[in-house]
């Protein structure tokens, strides 16, 4: 499975794509999962949001996780670390690909807008009003993609 995003040269420099995909095209389940063909953008951090998108990925959805530059998701350092990444992070971010983007910056906002253009679902778990302040509220994203489903998890 490949992520196909067209970036302008400045956006390409701002975004770093990495792969955390454990399902290969040679897998016996590739292409026959219940959520095959569903694209999920995961801009959540900590546990609740990433765990919900983990389950979507487990059922075949293509999940793209957006992490902040420098530190990534806070869970990266939890538990026993190997090569600077904790087991909990690897567990809840399996079957995902990762993009680095600063959601507080205009370039980061543009990256998310481009990702949701052809996405089916976006998962987030920020405090009420945070995404709206950054220009990424449902009202803005649904203008880009009217069929977008936004999953908001707090706790």
Label every model-predicted segment:
Residues 5-155:
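N-terminal helix-loop segment corresponding to the beta1-alpha1 unit
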């Amino acid at each position: 499975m490949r992520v196909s995003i067209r970036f302008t040269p400045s956006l390409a420099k701002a975004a770093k794509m990495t792969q955390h995909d454990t399902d290969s095209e040679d897998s016996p389940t590739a292409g026959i999962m219940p959520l095959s063909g569903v694209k999920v953008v995961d801009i959540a951090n900590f546990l609740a949001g990433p765990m919900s998108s983990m389950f979507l990925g487990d059922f075949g959805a293509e999940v793209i996780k957006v992490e902040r530059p420098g530190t990534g998701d806070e869970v990266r350092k939890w538990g026993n670390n190997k090569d600077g990444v904790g087991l909990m992070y690897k567990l809840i971010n399996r079957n995902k690909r990762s993009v680095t983007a600063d959601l507080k910056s205009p370039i980061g906002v543009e990256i998310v807008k481009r990702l949701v253009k052809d996405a089916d679902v976006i998962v987030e778990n920020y405090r009420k009003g945070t995404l709206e302040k950054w220009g990424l509220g449902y009202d803005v994203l649904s203008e880009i993609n009217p069929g977008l489903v936004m999953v908001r998890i707090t706790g």
